Structures are given as structure tokens and as C-alpha cells.
Amino acid sequence: MAHKKAGGSSRNGRDSESKRLGVKKFGGETVIAGNIIIRQRGTRWHPGDNVGIGKDHTLFALSNGVVSFQRKANNRSYVSVVSMVEAEE
């Protein structure tokens, strides 16, 4: 009577898919209008000049240029897109 008892089912083995958040274009990188600069939850970075914000707080370029990060007096981080002409000056 060599019977093997059925093993119990495990209650582990579930995990959510990663959301691939984070900075997609870093400071000094060239972007074209519509490029996603940052995917984030909440406003860890705020939109500056020539940057729009989506309903999921994604920051994206509104014009062609170079990405610039800065921290203002209110201690918030802002992301801007500086046009190529301004960047050369």
C-alpha cells in the first residue's frame, strides 16, 4: 500500500507586475515634444517650463530641447525643457 498523499496547495506565488517608474530622460539629454521624461506616483518632481503633466503624474516634453532639473526655494524639484537656442547661450 505505497500511496503518496497529495501535497497541499501553496498560498504564495503571487506578485504584481512592475510598473517601470522612474526617470526616462536625464538632465542634459535632448528630447522632442511628446517624449516622456519621468513616470512617477504622485508629484515627486513637478513640471517646469515646457513640461506637461499627465493624469497619472507622468511628466512629458511640450517642446524640443534639453532636459533640466532644478530645486527651487520651496524645496520642490522641477523639471524643465530648455530650447536648443537658449541652451547654446
From Swiss-Prot:
GO molecular function term, any single one: structural constituent of ribosome
Keyword Ribonucleoprotein part of the UniProt annotation: yes
UniProt-listed InterPro entries: Ribosomal_bL27, Ribosomal_bL27_CS
Disordered as annotated region, ranges: 1-21
Disulphide bridges: none
PROSITE patterns with a match to the protein in the record: RIBOSOMAL_L27
Segments traversing the membrane: none
Keywords: Ribonucleoprotein, Ribosomal protein
GO biological-process terms attached to the record: translation
Cellular component, GO annotation: cytosolic large ribosomal subunit
Keyword set includes Coiled coil: no
Pfam families listed in its UniProt record: Ribosomal_L27 (PF01016)
Entry similarity comment: Belongs to the bacterial ribosomal protein bL27 family.
HAMAP family found in the cross-reference section: Ribosomal_bL27
Protein known as: Large ribosomal subunit protein bL27
Source species: Bartonella quintana (strain Toulouse)
Upper classification of the organism: Bacteria, Pseudomonadati, Pseudomonadota, Alphaproteobacteria, Hyphomicrobiales
